[in-house]
Amino acid sequence: MYTAKEVILSQIKPALGCTEPAAIALNGAYLKEYVKNAKKIQLTINTNLMKNAMYVPIPNTGKKFGVKLAFALGYLCGDKTKGLNVFENIDKKCIEEAEKYINKIELDIVEGREIYIKSEAEGCEVITKKFHDYISSIKTSEKVITFESKNIDNNISDTEKWLKKISFDTLYRLIEKEKDFDFVKNAVDVNFELSKIGLNSDCGLNIGKSYKGDDIFSKIVSITVSASDARMEGVNYPAMSLVGSGNHGISAILPVWVYGKEKNFQENEIFKAVALSMLITIYIKLFIGRLSAICGAAFASGCGVAGGIAYLESNNKEVSKKAVSYVIQDINGVICDGAKMACSLKVRLGAKSGYEAAMFALEGKPVFSDGILENDITKSIQNLSRVSEAMYNVDGSIVEIMKNKII
């Protein structure tokens, strides 16, 4: 049995910009340690990773993007000790060098939904697997090194296996056993700072700024989406990522926190509800997949927001579960067509659906076990896993469309 704190801390970490380009760059930074100034590099990534790395702006580049560019920046200028903040020190000179270097990189796309990156040069091979910052092996002409990178919790796999075996109700027991929720404070602070950047400057699509009302819903959407606007712009400030995604962290954390602050709940109560939202998001993501055809920033985090806000107001797990069920019925089929600045629109959708679902549940509106919804919410989420698997061909079609435009 793991604690709520252990589960959450295993799944959060700061990440600068979108995590897929960062993962690619980090792989390049590791390759540089063994092969410098390679005349040719063979880069292989899986389809879903490519989908989320192709068109999203890279931090500190002035909105430049591209899979090869991300790798070249990491290979030429990246610091592997920075982990998913690998783009932190990118400057103009590095960008110019990287743009020239991309002609030396050959890119191959292979089928697969699980994170996979392999770079090869002059007899050296670096492989990233399963997690964005997990360098699983490094092979040189002299030796093979298999190891856990410093940026990954060795117990993540065991934690995830355990989570997929427990019931949804167990999440509430984990939350109730925790007494002090200060461990989520840093995540709230980091993402709120990112939101302030989005609110105070022109970032991404500037969707967050469109919500100017003083009502609680407008404030939730404005603050949450502004953080995503800033992140997808590629500003030089990290998001606190959740389950490998900055937008998941933003959209699971900020709506619940804003709601609690606006309603004047005690800080520990708010952090408790935020922790529940994060747990629900993690739980659902493990069933639909880290990289899938379903947009987790809208759907999984939306479920977390609904459950967190409803629990904060009612302190009743049945009301909270009902709220989650509303989101399942509302937006369960929203697709992910790759990371880009427009992702802030889907973050908006998750915040909206989560907030409204919580209100419906608190008003006592009925929930019916139709469609993919079951009387047992654990089974409903297992059904979502089946839907996600069945959408593999949908995902493939999206990736094929994007491959025809590949840069």
UniProtKB/Swiss-Prot annotation:
Coiled coil: none annotated. Pfam families: SDH_alpha. It comes from the Bacteria. GO terms for molecular function: L-cysteine desulfhydrase activity. GO terms for biological process: L-cysteine catabolic process to pyruvate. Belongs to the UPF0597 family. This is UPF0597 protein NAMH_0191. It comes from Nautilia profundicola (strain ATCC BAA-1463 / DSM 18972 / AmH).
